[in-house]
Design a protein with these regions (language model features):
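Active-site acidic catalytic loop and adjacent metal/ATP-binding pocket
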Residues: 25-45, 159-202
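ATP/Mg2+ or Mg2+-diphosphate-binding catalytic cores
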Residues: 140, 219, 255-293
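Conserved NTP-binding catalytic cores of kinases and kinase-like/nucleotidyltransferase enzymes
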Residues: 1-73, 184, 293
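Active-site activation/catalytic loop segments of kinase-like enzymes and analogous catalytic loops
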Residues: 201-234, 250-268
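All-alpha amphipathic helical-bundle segments outside canonical DNA-binding/catalytic cores
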Residues: 235-249
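A conserved alpha-helical element in kinase catalytic cores
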Residues: 44-83, 92, 97-115
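Activation segment
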Residues: 50, 93, 187, 195-197, ...
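A cross-family kinase active-site recognition segment
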Residues: 95-149, 166-168, 197
Length: 293
């Protein structure tokens, strides 16, 4: 196997599956495949980044197995040329038909997050990985050759952010609509790579950031938030959810903006509409911080 470009067929054979293989995701690092996710028959196989902490991953997989009805349970953990590889039942992800029909599962997402946040944190589970994504995104921004005028508002917004609030709830750590699939007749959360104790508002922060940037329709945001609260979610206050959401939503805005413009710069492309909306949101964060001083 080429160590610089992990082969999809190798993953399928590791799972004991032959036949057509579909690459669902491939993320490249500087010189080699960082993450590779493939579907082979009725399973999905994921090669994790080099250097993934095996103890932490095993703890998260064990936690996912115990979240029946909330999170998809793994089928196994293997190794391939030093890489940790997880094997999963294949679920049915969100499709464009769902989006066009107005049946995106915002309510199910809110309900599942509320159920997750109500579960006790298993002993030995590492902290939620979501907050650590922000400094990584900023490091990526710094190394991607982003033009200074584009990077400036992101850097300025980053400087205004408060420290991450600690929390003891069981959280997903990186939730968005790509982290939910249909399986066994219902929707389930997937991808426990960042699962752990943390501030539960962080799990609502990405859609909150989209909403604040004008990238998520108000009705969709309301569907998610209403369902979350109706299911007993405690991450935010019903009377003023932004009291808890403001800081993590600003952090996710900065993270998403940094990732978007860095990705575009590496591809030699200007910021797209979504990236521009996120950068504009960073400018508003800076303006609000200046107005408050």
């Amino acid at each position: 196997m080429d160590d610089h470009r992990l082969q999809a067929g190798e993953l399928a054979r590791l799972a004991g599956r032959d036949g057509p293989v579909t690459v669902l995701k491939r993320t490249m690092g500087l010189e080699r495949t960082k993450v590779l996710v493939v579907r082979a028959g009725d399973v999905v196989v994921k090669a994790h980044p080099p250097g993934t902490d095996e103890k932490a991953l095993r703890a998260r997989l064990d936690a996912a197995r115990a979240l029946d009805g909330i999170m998809l349970a793994p089928l196994g953990l293997e190794r391939l040329d030093g890489r940790l590889v997880t094997i999963w039942p294949a679920g049915e992800p969100l499709t464009m038909d769902d989006v066009e029909a107005g049946t995106t599962p915002w309510e199910e997402g809110g309900r599942l997050l509320a159920l997750l946040h109500a579960r006790p944190v298993p002993a030995g589970l590492p902290p939620a990985g979501g907050p650590s994504r922000l400094p990584r995104a900023m490091a990526d921004l710094a190394s991607a050759g982003v033009p200074a005028p584009v990077a400036a508002p992101i850097l300025e917004a980053y400087a205004t952010l408060p420290p991450v609030r600690e929390g003891g709830a069981l959280t997903h750590g990186d939730w968005h609509l790509g982290q939910i699939v249909r399986h066994g007749g219902g929707w389930l959360l997937i991808d426990p790579d960042d699962l752990g104790p943390g501030d539960p508002a962080w799990d609502l922060a990405r859609p909150a950031a989209w909403f604040a940037a004008g990238l998520l329709a108000p009705d969709d945001w309301e569907r998610l938030l209403t369902a979350y609260l109706a299911a007993g979610g405690t991450a935010v206050s019903a009377d003023d959810p932004w009291r808890e959401l403001d800081a993590p939503a600003r952090a996710l805005t900065v993270q998403l903006a940094a990732t978007a413009v860095a990705t575009g710069a590496r591809a030699g492309e200007p910021p797209d509409d979504a990236a521009e909306a996120l950068v504009s949101a960073c400018e508003r964060i800076v303006a609000a911080a200046r107005a408050g001083t």
